[in-house]
Amino acid sequence: MVKIGGVFVCLLIVAMDIVAGILGIEAELEQNKVKQLRLWIFECREPSHPAFKLGMGAAALLVLAHVISNLLGGCNNCICSQDELQKAPPNRQLSLACLVFTWVILAVGLSMLVIGTWSNHKSGASCGFTHHHFLSIGGILCFVHGLFCVAYYITATSTD
């Protein structure tokens, strides 16, 4: 029963991150459909409400997948010193590395999604520096996040 639950959790995390990635890429495509005027590195364009909604959905799913993997992965990675890290079994070291990578990918991916989504929040046209590909890069990082979350969950819940 535990193995079936673990498989379900892994599939849930992967599905949420895949949907988040697809929503991020779709948001980028919707953003590219609006009118824009570009002059060198400056750009004026209308915000896209569909891109805003898709970006918000992608960010929410990314955070939810991260929370689920961290809560269900457990908290057995408490390593307080370099000496403890060196004495820890390889499985625990790998688990800690995956945990660190999931947090880094979450920080970068969520930042990209929020910046890309925020540029579509305003009600009128805005001008400024170009914000190209933030949503699609955030979407791609959602896929990578799914891989590391599953690796973390598997290594954190497996026996040493």
Predicted regions, residues:
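Eukaryotic helix-linker segments that join adjacent hydrophobic helices
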Residues: 57, 62-65
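Short amphipathic alpha-helical segments
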Residues: 68
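Membrane-proximal loop-to-helix boundary features in eukaryotic membrane proteins
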Residues: 1-13, 19-57, 71-160
